Amino acid sequence: MPTSTTPAVERIARVLAARQLSLNGGGSDPHAAQAVDETWRDHVEDAYAILHTLREPDADMAQAGDVAVWRSMIGAVLERRVGA
């Protein structure tokens, strides 16, 4: 299975920043890549909040896969925050 080299928290924070800044996401900047690079860290707490909410899968998610694996994966990200 392919994995990302960018941590999940950073990827989520970048999406949140892009949604605010990018014309594609509802912002006003048609070329927001540099601004996202400069501001994604402002969204890290929101990214952790999203992951915290997702730590328990919903019924459809649980039916599609292994709940213990899901909890372990999300938990690994959240534990890094505590250890930071």
Segments (PLM) and residue ranges:
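Amphipathic alpha-helical oligomerization segments
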Residues: 2-35, 49-70, 81-84
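Beta-rich globular "head" domains
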Residues: 12, 42-45
